[in-house]
């Protein structure tokens, strides 16, 4: 799934690995961006939830700002840490397990999304719909390219 996404910069190592590699500042910048992304998700939900329904396309503004990879990573992190919570749909929890989020000395708890789980579940579904649309468009473009060859 990640291979077809635009090349969005994400630092792949834990803080300990970054320290060992002499790249701690790069890790810190990535970590701060993960935290900001989690905050942007909370703000988008606050903006687009009317008390009963989450506005369609709520995830798009956050995706436009932070990219598919980072938004997916931050969402997966929250669902993985809340795997016990029955308010998340099983398909969303299963999706979250397809994304590797390393244990990082407790740092991953810092970019945990604090929105209500039932509403966040709707945001995750909206994100996944956006991702599926991207995949469909990418597949269609590849098919069109094959037809012109």
Predicted regions and their residues:
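Gram-negative host-targeted secretion-system effectors, predominantly Type III and Type IV
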Residues: 1-148
């Amino acid at each position: 799934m990640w291979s077809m996404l635009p090349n969005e910069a994400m630092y792949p190592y834990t803080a300990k690995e970054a320290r060992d590699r002499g790249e701690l500042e790069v890790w810190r910048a990535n970590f701060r961006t993960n935290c900001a992304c989690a905050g942007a998700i909370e703000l988008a939900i606050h903006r687009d939830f009317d008390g009963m329904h989450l506005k369609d396309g709520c995830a798009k503004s956050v995706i436009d700002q932070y990219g598919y990879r980072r938004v997916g990573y931050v969402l997966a992190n929250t669902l993985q840490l809340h795997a016990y919570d029955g308010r998340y749909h099983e398909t969303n929890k299963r999706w979250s397990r397809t994304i590797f989020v390393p244990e990082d000395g407790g740092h991953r708890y810092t970019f945990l999304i604090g929105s209500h789980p039932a509403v966040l579940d709707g945001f995750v579904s909206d994100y996944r719909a956006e991702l599926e649309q991207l995949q469909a468009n990418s597949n269609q473009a590849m098919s069109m390219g094959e037809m012109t060859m």
